[in-house]
């Protein structure tokens, strides 16, 4: 086993004009120092299809001399031990040519890469807003957020001369297999990705990052397994984040509080090379009833690493802005914010013109109000500062709605009934700490009458039947129907 430690850029905008590796190469245990000049060719992926071939930082590592964000990998040291690789990486001298830097936290539509995209539209929101009796027109911002699970991103790559076996911290082994095969330039059947257990990811481990390609290519060049663990400080720079958003929300309403217009115009930053859109209107179109709605989105470039999915991407920052605006409207109407939400509850998804498969928002509001004693609330800002030991600790009581899609995707699974009275269930999905192993053993056990300890669950390996990503809260809902179908077929044989 060899250990790889990247050399990270100390500028955020410019180019590498020289790399002095002489001292590092002479240090004990060092096998190689790789950079643009000697790393070989890696390839970009084709546009993804479904949940296959997705990668947010599309530029292969060391692809050119450009530096577009602080912490970008510009070289990597491979050595016999992690300590030797770290010491050598620290001794590599990189010379840069700097360029103008843009990390500004205020966005304007004039900076947008393209004309804002219309994500959803119905009616004539501009006219309805212009004639509305009451209006809210505010801008809301959410900050950059990083995932930082306790388990660091890491890769162990083993190339045997023809095939790659990649042990990855990934929430999507099948997608990782496809991406790695494309970028390494080998057939997909020559790549096996394994992720048996995962110390969470929060979306940051859904798609492969450059460290995975570096480990795999280094293994190919060295002919030995290579391990690369992303350092904690690099977790803030090179493995994605939820981007800062800036959203203008316009609500128009009658004097009674019925919404006549909803408009949401969102901006988020992306990297200098990639086009990540946060999608802040994910839930806007179906949150409240209105005949007139428009949601647009646009991206602006900044010298940062590529953003990525994080815990309810789009919906979380988008609903923060929408719900804040609903509270502003309640204040101007001088009505209870729960009452405002109840009177604007939609009977169906007005964007799709379809009934909801499930929706319990009204129930949540009413039960929550009863359980929390909402009737005791006073509306004035700062009027509920607490009494006794709680004095001064609160500003008031608030309410906000939230929503997430109940989506499912295709999945495959196998179930084997073994001669020793046990069973095995397999699928190339993952357990990111949410209990997929336990859930599947319980489901199969209930169906065939076995205790869960007599059921082996095998996950996280692309040699298994293709399973769903562990993201979007849909892995369990997607894989269980496949497992139940396999159980039925196995018991009928």
Stretches with model-predicted labels:
Residues 36, 190-196, 223-233, 260-265, ...:
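Beta-strand segments within the central parallel beta-sheet cores of soluble alpha/beta enzyme folds
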Residues 4, 90-103, 171, 178, ...:
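Extended active-site and interfacial segments that coordinate phosphate-rich ligands
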Residues 1-116, 138, 211:
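Flexible, low-hydrophobicity surface segments
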Residues 34-72, 175, 193-214, 233-248, ...:
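Short, surface-exposed loop/turn segments at secondary-structure boundaries that line and modulate
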Residues 73, 80-81, 223-272, 484-493:
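Phosphate/diphosphate-binding loops
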Residues 107-184, 345-422, 442:
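Helix-loop-helix junctions that connect adjacent transmembrane helices in secondary transporters/permeases
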Residues 75-79, 85-89, 213-225, 317-321, ...:
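Stable alpha-helical structural segments in soluble proteins, enriched in small hydrophobic residues
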């Amino acid at each position: 086993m060899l250990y790889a430690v990247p050399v990270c850029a100390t500028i955020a905008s410019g180019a590498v004009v020289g790399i002095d590796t002489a001292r590092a190469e002479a240090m004990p245990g060092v096998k190689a120092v790789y950079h643009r000049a000697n790393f070989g060719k890696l390839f970009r992926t084709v546009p993804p299809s479904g949940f296959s071939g997705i990668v947010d930082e599309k530029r292969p590592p060391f692809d050119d001399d450009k530096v577009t964000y602080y912490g970008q990998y510009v070289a990597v040291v491979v050595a016999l031990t992690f300590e030797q690789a770290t010491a050598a990486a620290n001794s590599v001298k990189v010379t840069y040519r700097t360029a103008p830097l843009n990390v500004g936290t205020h966005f304007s539509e004039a900076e947008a890469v393209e004309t804002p995209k219309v994500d959803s539209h119905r009616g004539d929101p501009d006219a309805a807003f212009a004639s509305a009796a009451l209006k809210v027109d505010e801008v809301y911002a959410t900050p950059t957020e990083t995932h930082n699970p306790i388990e660091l991103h890491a890769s162990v790559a083993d190339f045997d001369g023809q095939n790659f076996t990649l042990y990855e911290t990934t929430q999507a082994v099948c997608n990782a297999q496809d991406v790695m095969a494309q970028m390494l330039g080998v057939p997909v059947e020559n790549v096996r990705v394994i992720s048996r257990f995962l110390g969470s990811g929060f979306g940051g481990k859904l798609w492969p990052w450059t460290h995975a390609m570096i480990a795999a290519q280094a293994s190919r060049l060295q002919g030995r397994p290579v391990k690369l663990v992303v350092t904690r400080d690099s977790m803030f720079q090179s493995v994605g984040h939820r981007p800062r958003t800036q959203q203008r929300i316009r609500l128009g309403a009658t004097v009674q509080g019925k919404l006549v217009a909803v408009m949401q115009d969102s901006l988020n930053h992306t990297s200098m090379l990639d086009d990540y859109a946060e999608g802040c209107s994910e839930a806007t179109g179906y949150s409240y009833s209105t005949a007139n709605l428009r949601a647009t989105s646009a991206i602006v470039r900044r010298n940062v690493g590529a953003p990525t999915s994080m815990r309810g991407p789009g919906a979380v920052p988008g609903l923060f802005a929408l719900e804040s605006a609903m509270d502003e409207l309640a204040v101007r109407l001088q009505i209870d914010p729960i009452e405002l939400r109840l009177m604007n509850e939609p009977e169906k998804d007005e964007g799709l013109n379809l009934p909801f498969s499930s929706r319990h928002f009204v129930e949540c509001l009413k039960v929550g109000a009863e359980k929390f004693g909402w009737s005791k609330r006073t509306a004035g800002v700062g009027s509920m500062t607490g009494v006794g030991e709680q004095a001064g600790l609160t500003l008031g009581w608030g309410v906000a709605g939230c929503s997430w899609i109940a989506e499912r995707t295709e999945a495959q699974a196998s179930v084997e009934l073994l001669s020793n009275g046990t069973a095995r269930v397999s699928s190339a999905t993952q357990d990111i700490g949410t209990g997929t192993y336990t859930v599947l053993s319980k489901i199969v056990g209930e169906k065939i009458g076995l205790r869960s300890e007599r059921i082996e669950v095998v996950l996280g390996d692309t040699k298994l039947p293709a399973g769903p990503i562990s993201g979007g809260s849909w892995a369990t809902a997607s894989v269980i129907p496949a497992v139940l179908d396999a159980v039925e077929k196995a018991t009928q044989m």
